[in-house]
Design a protein with these regions (language model features):
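Bacterial N-terminal signal peptides that target proteins for export
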Residues: 1-9
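Polar helix-capping/helix-linker motif
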Residues: 2, 122-123
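C-terminal segment of classical bacterial N-terminal signal peptides
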Residues: 13-23
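N-terminal secretory/targeting leader peptides
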Residues: 23-116, 123, 127-340
Length: 340
């Protein structure tokens, strides 16, 4: 009898140890649609994975999948449906799905991706959480790239009217409405398609942060850069996790994971974008692209023409049950504080 009990106890202990070992080897599979050298991967997702492993004391590891699982717009559902555990993408790639996230794409928010990203996350937590726009997944973080500017191969842009009828690639979201207001013909394509549409004449130019011009090797396809102080737009990104996978982690592991996500990831991402933009500007000038900045008169007209964007977002926020004016005021105050 004693041998039988001992055997049972041994089996139970062995099973517990096996389960513990299995739990200790939790691996989060990250879907990726960008080259491994892109700042999102090299300077954000991969370092975040190391931070997760360190924060969880090796109990949770992060693995970037070697091949894309779908087009960029599919990545929210790729996480939601459990095809991958973690994904990132652009909110504006799925028009109509998100509304509150457009706040981070409004014109003239600032020149620092780090400041805007942190302020954006804080605003999301404080004002947008109850609207649950990311329902079906665990929202790990939100962030933006640096200020968006105008690049083209046709003519220098000195006044707002110079933009009329130019075919410009835009990434979706609020910049689509902005481009139409300015008389631009918007061309929709994910960023990895930029080289193709510019060299094939599908687009005359592109709206991008400085970083993206050398990265996507489109510097030879462009002649002019128009800098917009505080940015014509930013692009809003999400980092999300399959809800069931998140809930499968222990409470301690969840807390550790979130300690390096949320604001910590927004800071990491924003800082990486700012550094990449600085390097991008150096490359743009070295490539011989003519750089100009809109003067005060052009900026005054631009701000007047684009005032509709804020009003439109405030209406969307109201529809979602959010005090948009309070949220936007808070976000701008945080950006100003963080930019000092």
């Amino acid at each position: 009898m004693r041998k039988y009990v001992a055997a049972l106890l041994g089996a139970a202990v062995g099973a517990a140890m096996t389960a513990s070992a299995a739990h200790a080897e939790t691996t989060l599979r990250v879907a990726n649609w960008l080259p491994p050298t892109h700042p999102i991967m090299k300077d954000m997702v991969v370092p975040w994975g190391k931070m997760v492993e360190e924060a969880t004391k090796g109990k949770v590891k992060v693995e970037v999948l070697p091949a894309p699982l779908g087009a960029p717009p599919a990545h929210f559902d790729i996480a939601k449906d459990g095809i991958a555990d973690v994904t990132y993408s652009v909110h504006g790639y799925t028009p109509g799905r998100f509304a509150l996230t457009d706040v981070a794409e409004l014109p003239f928010l600032g020149n620092s991706a780090e400041a805007i990203s942190i302020a954006y996350w804080r605003t999301t937590e404080k004002y947008f959480a109850k609207a649950d726009e990311h329902k079906g997944v665990k929202l790990l973080s939100v962030f933006v790239h640096g200020p968006g500017h105008i690049f083209n191969a046709k003519r220098p842009i000195k006044a707002v009217g110079d933009l009329k009828d130019l075919k410009i690639r835009v990434g979706g979201g609020i910049i689509n409405d902005i481009s139409k207001e300015l008389g631009i013909v918007p061309i929709h394509a994910p960023s990895p398609k930029s080289y193709e549409i510019l060299t094939n004449g599908v687009a005359d130019g592109i709206m991008f942060p400085s970083e993206s011009v050398p990265f996507f090797k489109i510097d030879k396809a462009l002649k002019y850069m128009t800098e917009v102080p505080d940015g014509l737009y930013n692009t809003s990104f999400f980092l999300v996790m399959n809800q069931a996978k998140f809930e499968s982690l222990s409470k301690d592991e969840q807390a550790a994971l979130m300690s390096v996500s949320g604001e910590a990831f927004a800071r990491l991402a924003g800082k990486a974008w700012d550094a990449a933009d600085a390097a991008g500007m150096t490359a743009i000038k070295a490539a011989g692209i003519e750089v100009s900045k809109l003067d005060d008169a052009a900026m005054a007209e631009l701000k007047k023409r684009l005032a509709f964007a804020e009003a439109k977002w405030l209406d969307k926020a109201k529809e979602r049950g959010v005090d948009g004016l309070a949220a936007l005021s808070y976000m701008r105050a945080e950006i100003a504080k963080l930019s000092k």
